[in-house]
């Protein structure tokens, strides 16, 4: 009886194994097309060290360290605002922010920062190819007038081949800034 039971178990096990779907023991054969890298899309994520550069730049501006902020700027950098104003050259940008931080702004903080580094491989409009850092942050400023300004801002930084910032585009609402700086 034990032998019959043992034989029955073996037959049932063999039946179950033979009816089970086969596992893929072999990897599918690769072709030459599988080993070549696909062309990059028009835009892809860039390295996170660009986020660090942007974060350090804002932190330096917040503390009044204009030299630290400018450490990652190219000599030919351009700083543009959405109202059409702009500054050309590292020295002009440095002097502008030095003047603002020493004569106009008492304190400046940034919070709720969001960063997105991207590499534009195929420009779709008038943007330049290369690495861009998109950032959004809440800006809180207290001016020498005693008035305060609080608003969300959006900045876009472009990096040259040496990882230096050569373009900044800043989108902000000028009305609260004008109101806070009025005497």
What positions do the PLM features span?
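Short, surface-exposed coil-to-beta transition loops
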Residues: 136, 149-154
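A short gly/proline-enriched turn/hairpin at secondary-structure junctions
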Residues: 78-88, 103, 123
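Surface-exposed, charged secondary-structure patches
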Residues: 97-145
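C-terminal motif of bacterial Sec signal peptides marking the signal peptidase cleavage site
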Residues: 15-18
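Low-complexity, intrinsically disordered terminal/linker segments enriched in charged
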Residues: 166-183
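Sec-dependent N-terminal signal peptides
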Residues: 4-13
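Short, low-complexity N-terminal intrinsically disordered segments enriched in polar/charged residues
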Residues: 20-63, 67, 71
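Positively charged n-region of N-terminal signal peptides that target proteins for export
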Residues: 1-5, 21
């Amino acid at each position: 009886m034990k032998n019959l039971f043992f034989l029955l178990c073996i037959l049932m096990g063999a039946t179950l194994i033979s009816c089970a779907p086969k596992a893929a023991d072999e990897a599918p054969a690769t072709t030459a097309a599988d080993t070549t890298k696909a062309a990059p899309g028009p835009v892809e994520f860039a390295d996170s060290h660009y986020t660090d550069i942007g974060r350090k730049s804002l932190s330096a501006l917040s503390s009044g360290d204009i030299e630290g902020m400018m450490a990652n700027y190219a000599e030919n950098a351009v700083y543009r605002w959405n109202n059409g104003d702009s500054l050309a050259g590292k020295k002009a940008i440095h002097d502008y922010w030095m003047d603002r931080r020493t004569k106009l702004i008492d304190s400046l903080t940034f919070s709720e920062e969001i960063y997105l580094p991207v590499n534009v491989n195929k420009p779709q409009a008038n943007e330049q190819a290369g690495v861009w850092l998109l950032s959004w942050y809440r800006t809180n400023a207290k001016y020498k007038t005693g008035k305060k300004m609080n608003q969300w801002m959006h900045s876009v930084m472009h990096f040259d081949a040496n990882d230096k910032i050569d373009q900044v585009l800043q989108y902000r609402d000028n009305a609260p800034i004008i109101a806070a700086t009025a005497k």
